[in-house]
């Protein structure tokens, strides 16, 4: 009787919770919004939307695991399409075999990739294939490529953005030819790099900007770089950004994680794990920032900061692969080909390395004194030692 009473109370509580409005997380409603794209319907579909997301996939095989993986991605796309139904964003599937001609025409060459068509641009999504990540990415993509700053409060908000590459320019008006060039350059990098502009003399004075000048801010740096030789063409701005696109310290983000990981230096990444919300992680991150600021002119140095809180599904994998504890700050060098790694010895959270000690360790990495090949040698030694132990035990058994 007591159990029955508790069950009824439980159902009532759940029903009451479901009756509340304002926190209804979306669940797939079963309606098909993702359509198959073909040469026949391509132009019609393209005209219908401001953005078109195309999932380019290999033919669905008879393998059950492969079928389930495909269905999971299809459900993710259906949920994203449902959430963004009020936006002018379309979602389609492109079969690599059935629509090979269309895929070639669109320049698709990597099966399993998600491409977004916006105007005459094709953007490849190189991030985590998750509904929340995709929704945020697409919402950023439909925004204007340049955000206008016109007040002191907006300047403060701009200054607090420290973990993105950002640019800001001062122009006479939105009709200025130099602003138009800046806006067109911004479209090349949206939504990964943040572009801002102001037409306000007071804002420009506070940011020490001259007319038609653009400042480039590297992540976590105190001072910007004034792009030389103003005023600029679109091509000059694009070229400058591409040359400075790999910061000294950068954050791994779910929406561009694969592209960032592929942007290695000589096959390696210097990787730092630190939880920003944790006191020790925050302290370690501040040390990393200091090292980056002191070495920002070194083209061979790029540190990849990963906050484990951003990737909860990868924590166990990283701990197993790298043999480290991610509840503590860590820094190491990782071979991107085989995931071999060597990690700096940090005795405990209360004894974090100083900026000078970290710089010395990084210098050893860049010089090759510390490298992942040493880790391979140690593993081989361990294997040989195990084999010798096994041989000794076999000899003992024979003697008996």
UniProtKB/Swiss-Prot annotation:
GO terms for biological process: regulation of cardiac muscle contraction by regulation of the release of sequestered calcium ion. The keyword Lipid metabolism does not apply. Phosphorylation in the C-terminus, probably by CK2, moderately increases calcium buffering capacity. The modification Phosphotyrosine is found at residue 282. Residues 373-400 have a biased composition (Acidic residues). GO terms for molecular function: calcium ion binding. Residues 1-19 form the signal peptide. GO terms for cellular component: sarcoplasmic reticulum lumen; Z disc. Residues 365-400 are annotated as: Disordered. It is found in: Sarcoplasmic reticulum lumen. SUPFAM superfamilies: Thioredoxin-like. Keywords: Calcium, Glycoprotein, Metal-binding, Muscle protein, Phosphoprotein, Sarcoplasmic reticulum, Signal. Glycans are attached at residue 335. Calsequestrin is a high-capacity, moderate affinity, calcium-binding protein and thus acts as an internal calcium store in muscle. Calcium ions are bound by clusters of acidic residues at the protein surface, especially at the interface between subunits. Can bind around 60 Ca(2+) ions. Regulates the release of lumenal Ca(2+) via the calcium release channel RYR2; this plays an important role in triggering muscle contraction. Plays a role in excitation-contraction coupling in the heart and in regulating the rate of heart beats. Monomer, homodimer and homooligomer. Mostly monomeric in the absence of calcium. Forms higher oligomers in a calcium-dependent manner. Dimers associate to form tetramers, that then form linear homomer chains. Interacts with ASPH and TRDN. Belongs to the calsequestrin family. PANTHER family: CALSEQUESTRIN (PTHR10033), CALSEQUESTRIN-2 (PTHR10033:SF15). This is Calsequestrin-2. The lineage of its organism: Eukaryota, Metazoa, Chordata, Craniata, Vertebrata.
């Amino acid at each position: 009787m007591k159990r029955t009473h508790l069950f009824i109370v439980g159902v009532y509580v759940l029903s009451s919770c479901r009756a509340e409005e304002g926190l209804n997380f979306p669940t797939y409603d079963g309606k098909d919004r993702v359509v198959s794209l073909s040469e026949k319907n391509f132009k019609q579909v393209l005209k219908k939307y401001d953005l078109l997301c195309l999932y380019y996939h290999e033919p669905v095989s008879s393998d059950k695991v492969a079928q389930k993986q495909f269905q999971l991605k299809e459900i993710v796309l259906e949920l994203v399409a449902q959430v963004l139904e009020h936006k002018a964003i379309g979602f389609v599937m492109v079969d690599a075999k059935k629509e090979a001609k269309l895929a070639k025409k669109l320049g698709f060459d990597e099966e399993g990739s998600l491409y977004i068509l916006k105007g005459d641009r094709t953007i490849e999504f190189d991030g985590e294939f998750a509904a929340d990540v995709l929704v945020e990415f697409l919402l950023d993509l439909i925004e204007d490529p340049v955000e206008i700053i016109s007040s002191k409060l907006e300047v403060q908000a701009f200054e607090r953005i420290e973990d993105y590459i950002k640019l800001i320019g001062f122009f006479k008006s939105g009709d200025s030819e130099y602003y138009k060039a800046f806006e067109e350059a911004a479209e090349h990098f949206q939504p990964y790099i943040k572009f801002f502009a102001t037409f306000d003399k007071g804002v420009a004075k506070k940011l020490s900007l001259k007319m038609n000048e653009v400042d480039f801010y590297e992540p976590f740096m105190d001072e910007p770089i004034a792009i030389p030789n103003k005023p600029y063409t679109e091509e000059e701005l694009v070229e400058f950004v591409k040359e400075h696109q790999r910061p000294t310290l950068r954050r791994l983000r779910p929406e561009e994680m694969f592209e960032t990981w592929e942007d290695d230096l000589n096959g390696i990444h210097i990787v730092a794990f630190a939880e920003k919300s944790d006191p020790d992680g925050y302290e370690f991150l501040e040390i990393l920032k200091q090292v980056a600021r002191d070495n920002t002119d070194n083209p061979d140095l790029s540190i990849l900061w990963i906050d484990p809180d951003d990737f909860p599904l990868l924590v166990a994998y990283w701990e197993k692969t790298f043999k480290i504890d991610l509840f503590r700050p860590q820094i190491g060098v990782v071979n991107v080909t085989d995931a071999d790694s060597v990690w700096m010895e940090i005795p405990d959270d209360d004894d974090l390395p100083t900026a000078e000690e970290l710089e010395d360790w990084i210098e050893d990495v860049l010089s090759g004194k510390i490298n992942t090949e040493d880790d391979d040698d140690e593993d081989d030694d361990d294997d040989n030692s195990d084999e010798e132990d096994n041989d000794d035990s076999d000899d003992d058994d024979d003697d008996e």
